[in-house]
Design a protein with these regions (language model features):
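Short loop/turn segments at strand-loop or loop-helix junctions that form parts
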Residues: 30-36, 73-75, 106-108
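Inter-Walker segment of RecA-like/P-loop motor cores
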Residues: 1-30
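Conformational gate/switch positions in structured elements
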Residues: 1-3, 7-8, 34, 75, ...
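Conserved ATPase-coupling elements of RecA-like P-loop NTPase cores
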Residues: 35-54, 75-85
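Conserved helicase motor core of P-loop NTPases
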Residues: 61-67, 76-196
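Catalytic-core regions built around general acid/base machinery
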Residues: 53-63
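Loop/turn-to-beta-strand initiation segments
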Residues: 26-29, 64-71
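Conserved helicase NTPase motor core
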Residues: 23-32, 38-40, 57-58
Length: 196
């Protein structure tokens, strides 16, 4: 997104400021996947546009003649850090820009095997959220699935190393309960396993 909607305005001392680019496109549909990650939390001293990515994206797209925006993402994913909801997937927030908004939910999973424990748990959680019955963290079913393995902390580094070697990084996932915990795990994995 940043590469498309921002242009470098000035450059000094290793930092640059970027302003919203001109949208020269006409009658173009801009498609943004993983839109749940788009934040609109204002950043003081931001070097990109207004510091509010969703505001800047919408301003850029709709400044072009006849341009439209398609935002795709999973509303059940964690919202951007510091936000309660993913603003780019929240219909009322988008209507606040004066946009005509259409919302569609896709319910058929095509990228997971049907006997996946991850899929089973994600589907159950999504159903609880849709029924507005998710008042506390539900019990996650972990037994009986080939794609779920519970690993004690002292075995985590060895297990992840083995999984990366056997299955590859793209096929190995660590599930965390928060963005904060995911950042901690990511730093540890980079430092102790990937040596970055």
């Amino acid at each position: 997104i940043h590469k498309k909607i921002y242009r470098q305005q000035s450059f000094s001392n290793e930092t640059g400021n970027f302003s919203i680019n001109d949208n020269l496109a006409t009658h173009t549909l801009f498609i943004v996947d993983e839109a749940s990650m788009i934040s609109n939390e204002g950043l003081s001293g931001a070097m990109f546009g207004t510091g509010r990515l969703l505001d800047d994206l919408i301003q850029f797209v709709y400044s072009g003649t006849g341009c439209r925006l398609l935002l795709m993402g999973d509303t059940a994913q964690l919202p951007p850090v510091g936000e309660e909801l993913s603003p780019a997937l929240f219909t009322d927030a988008l209507k606040g820009y004066g946009l005509e908004v259409r919302e569609v939910d896709l319910t058929q999973v095509v990228r997971q095997v049907q006997d996946s424990g991850i899929l089973w748990n994600a589907t159950r959680l999504r159903e609880l959220i849709a029924e507005d019955e998710c008042y506390s963290l539900p019990k996650i079913r972990i037994s009986g699935f080939a794609d779920i393995k519970v690993v004690p902390g002292e075995e985590l580094i060895d297990t992840l190393t083995a999984c990366y070697e056997r299955d590859g990084m793209d096929e190995t996932i660590v599930v965390c309960r928060s963005n904060k915990r995911a950042n901690i795990y990511n730093k540890g994995i980079r430092a102790q396993i990937l040596y970055r």
